Swiss-Prot record:
Residues the entry annotates as binding Mg(2+): 7, 9, 159
GO annotations of cellular component type: cytosol
Organism domain of life: Bacteria
Keyword vocabulary terms for this entry: Calvin cycle, Carbohydrate metabolism, Hydrolase, Magnesium, Metal-binding, Photosynthesis
Acetylation recorded as keyword: no
EC numbers for this chain: 3.1.3.18
Name of the protein in question: Phosphoglycolate phosphatase
Needed cofactors: Mg(2+)
Known role: Specifically catalyzes the dephosphorylation of 2-phosphoglycolate.
NCBIfam families assigned: HAD-SF-IA-v1, PRK13225.1
Length: 212
């Protein structure tokens, strides 16, 4: 094992309820239906591609909405928290001399500000932000190559089926977490190498892989 790359929203940070609230506020401007509690359960079964298609947003509208959501999410940073157990997990992983990184569709400004506020920035050797909503494959491949890591010795940890797909396409160890956006059934169908129920499960997976 050389490195572990994390998604940000829904994997490290419990930001999805805030993102949904912001997206709902912009629904009238973009012509899609706001998400209620009943819709959210259905939404967790869909890929990002399906959500965008059903919303009927053009590429220009997608970019504009993402910019608005990221800007308002930045205003909400003081209220956002790590998922329970994540801070301890990150510290333990770094103590094993593993490189830690973040690759996310969120903005660099938001990610850096949150990490600094939480006192976690020094744990990460690389932060790559602003990746496309629908596919992270190219950005993930470029990051691994730039850092000189061997794909088979790198984990990508995310909460969406698109994260699993991107990791598998690049030849990384695909790790899915069940506490984020996509539900467990959808993640199982995406066939990750590891499916985690709690942050401590990742430490167990890493321990097992490092013994091989």
């Amino acid at each position: 094992m050389q490195a572990i790359i994390f998604d940000f929203d829904g994997t490290l940070v419990d930001s999805l309820p805030t993102v949904v609230a912001i997206a709902n506020a912009h629904a009238p401007d973009f012509g899609y239906d706001p998400i209620d509690e009943r819709d959210y359960a259905q939404l967790r079964q869909w890929s990002s591609r399906t959500i965008v298609r059903r919303a009927g947003l053009s590429p220009w509208q997608q970019a504009r909405l993402l910019q608005r959501v990221q800007r308002q999410l930045g205003d909400c940073l003081p209220a956002l928290q790590l998922f329970p157990g994540v801070a301890d997990l990150l510290a333990q992983l770094r103590s094993r001399s593993l490189c830690l990184g973040i690759l996310s569709s969120n903005s660099r400004q938001n990610i850096e500000a949150f990490l600094q506020r939480q006192g976690l920035r020094s744990l990460f050797s690389v932060v790559q932000a602003g990746t496309p909503i629908l596919s992270k494959r190219r950005a993930l491949s470029q990051l691994v190559a730039r850092e000189g890591w061997q794909p088979a010795a790198v984990m990508y940890v995310g909460d969406e089926t698109r994260d699993v797909e991107a990791a598998r396409q690049v030849g990384l160890i695909a790790v899915a977490v069940t506490w984020g956006f996509n539900d467990r059934q959808s993640l199982v169908a995406a066939c990750p190498d590891w499916l985690l129920e709690t942050p401590s499960d990742l430490l167990q997976a890493v321990t097992q892989l490092m013994r091989q």
